[in-house]
Structure formats: C-alpha cells, structure tokens
Design a protein with these regions (language model features):
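A generic structural signal for short coil/turn motifs at secondary-structure boundaries
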Residues: 35, 87, 212-213
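Acidic/histidine-rich catalytic cores and adjacent linkers
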Residues: 58-61, 68, 109-236
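Short, function-defining helix-loop hinge/capping sites that tune catalysis or transport
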Residues: 22, 70, 94, 205-206
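Conserved beta-strand -> loop -> alpha-helix junction used to position metal-binding or nucleic-acid-contacting
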Residues: 62-65, 69-111
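RNase H-like nuclease fold core
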Residues: 1-77, 174
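Short hydrophobic/aromatic residue motifs in ordered secondary structure
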Residues: 17, 89, 200-201
Length: 236
C-alpha cells in the first residue's frame, strides 16, 4: 500500500472477494490510495483501512453495515454518499423485475427514478413520493402471518410480505443521505461506485479469470501489483 498523507475531496471505497479473501480498496476518481486484505467485510476490518487515511470531505460507498459503522466512527465529519446503483440492485433482487403486487411494482418504479435524481429539489420530490408510497401501502407491508409455536401458549409471526418491506426499509434509510448529496457542489463527487466497479474491480476480475491456475497467494500478489500501478506514485 502506498500512503501519501494527502487529504482528498472524495474517496470511493468498495470490496472485492478473491477466493477466501476480500480486498478492501480505497481510491479517488483518479488514483488508488489504499487497500487491505481481510477474511471478510466487518467494521473492524474496514477500520484498519479507513483509520490510516486522512478523512475526506465526501465518501462514496455501497452502504455495507460494517463499512458504515467504521465510517461514522472514524470519519464523523465526512459526508456520506451511498451508491444508488447498489440500492437499485438490492431492491431489484428483493422484488425481481416483475413484482406480482401493485406495491412491489410501484416501489420498483420509484427505485428506477432514484437513479435519475441529481438535485435537491428532485430529491425532495422523490422523498415525498416514497412517503406517499408508504402511506398507501403501509398496511400491506406491515401485514403479519401468525402461526402456532410448539411452546404452549405462545405464537410466532413474521411479516407476510417481508421482501417488499425489506426493499422499502433500504430506500427509507437512503432518503436523508440522498438530500445531503443530491446537490453536488464539486464536479469530482460521483453518485455511485462505478469508478471503482468498472475502473478497478472489473479489470481485477478479468485478471483473476486469466490466471485461475494460480494459488490465491500468487493471485493476491498479482492484484497488489495492479493496484500499485494505479496509484499516483506509480504514475509519476
């Protein structure tokens, strides 16, 4: 890892799995600035990478739980921009592309609109539309299925439409972050991690695919060489 101590305006972070390991990567829109090998993503392991980097003004990420905890603990003043594309993928996975319910179809359409939000006014409108969706479908997503519990005198329950409810909860958590970051005061602030996904992770996956016969240790060294080649120091 190459550390320069430079304070960056925007940092994009994400993780990529290589066999039994995960490579946590931090970069700007131009350069890789740090990486860390860990067994899995958690607040502890994300902290190992984040704590050695100066806090930026903005950070763009996919909102993984452990990552968020590390960010809010170590970079409390940094403005968080969650990746909307990840939100879209997660909601699409929960609802599918062809939801059976009206609530699901409307929520999927609302998630598509999220990708086109660029300004605070648009964000406020989107937030109000999400609020209206909940008012209209709250009884549906809060519906419970109750079934007998083997323990006498008790009953168990679960949300009947838990996938739709889970998709809504994800968008609900995103709404305030959307307002903070929709008006981008600086052109270097991206709305998603595509700089990392396409510019770094995609070539890494191709690199590993072309060297599948290597041991994981050799693959890791190959990845580190590639990441170093994308640092500012290597490009000087």
């Amino acid at each position: 890892m190459v550390l320069t101590g430079e304070i960056h305006h925007t940092v994009i972070i994400d993780g990529i799995r290589i066999g039994p390991y995960v490579c946590l990567i931090a970069r700007t829109v131009k350069h890789v600035i740090g990486w860390e090998w860990v067994p899995y993503e958690s607040s502890q392991y994300w902290s190992q990478l984040i704590e050695i980097l100066p806090a930026p003004t903005y950070v763009v990420c996919d909102g993984q739980k452990g990552m968020l905890l590390a960010l809010t603990t170590l970079w409390p003043e940094t403005i968080l921009q969650r990746c909307r594309f990840h939100a879209w993928l997660n909601v699409k996975t929960k609802l599918t592309l062809h939801p059976e319910s009206i609530a699901g179809r409307q929520l999927l359409a609302l998630t598509r609109e999220l990708l086109q939000v660029h300004r605070k006014r648009e964000a406020r409108i989107w937030k109000h539309r999400l609020k209206y969706w909940y008012r209209k479908h709250s009884s549906y997503i809060n519906q419970r299925t109750i079934y007998p519990n083997p323990i006498k005198g008790q009953r168990k329950w679960h949300y009947t439409h838990y996938r739709t409810r889970s998709a809504y909860r994800q968008l609900y958590k995103l709404r305030d972050d959307l307002l903070r970051s929709s008006y981008r005061p600086h052109p270097s602030l991206p709305r998603n991690t595509n700089f990392l996904e396409g510019g770094i992770n995609s070539p890494l996956r191709t690199l590993i695919k072309n060297h599948r016969g290597m041991s994981y240790e050799h693959q890791m060294k190959l990845i580190e060489q590639y990441l170093y080649s994308r640092t500012e120091v290597a490009k000087i």
